């Protein structure tokens, strides 16, 4: 595995990351927590240190899986997470459907 330094830090991030959308949402088949954690731990064993998550991936499930898989390894992984789609108020709409209205103003 190749790694890169992350700007002005001591972090070494794998060039390949593992996105957790597919194991968190159930849109491409169901993954039990045990299956998802095993996959994530295998990726780590193969050198992957970057994991892509979001609060909307399975309504927070991706971040819960990270906790289960890497409870004692937190200082050895990098989590890229994000916010944006509001599934709480707009249901579990998928990309490709009509755009969900967003309001990123300070008053929102």
Region locations from a protein language model:
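N-terminal binding-site loop/beta-alpha segment at the start of enzyme catalytic domains
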Residues: 1-81, 85-93
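Glycine/proline-rich, positively charged
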Residues: 91-108
């Amino acid at each position: 595995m190749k790694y890169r330094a992350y700007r002005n830090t001591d972090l070494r991030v794998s060039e390949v990351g593992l996105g957790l959308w597919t194991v968190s949402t159930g849109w491409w088949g169901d993954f039990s927590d045990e299956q998802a954690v095993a996959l994530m731990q295998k990726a780590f064993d193969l050198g992957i240190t970057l994991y892509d998550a979001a609060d909307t991936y399975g309504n927070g499930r991706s971040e819960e899986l990270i906790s289960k898989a890497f409870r004692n390894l937190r200082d050895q992984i990098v989590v890229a997470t994000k916010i944006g789609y509001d599934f709480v108020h707009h249901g579990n709409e998928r990309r490709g459907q009509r755009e969900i209205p967003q309001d990123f103003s300070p008053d929102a």
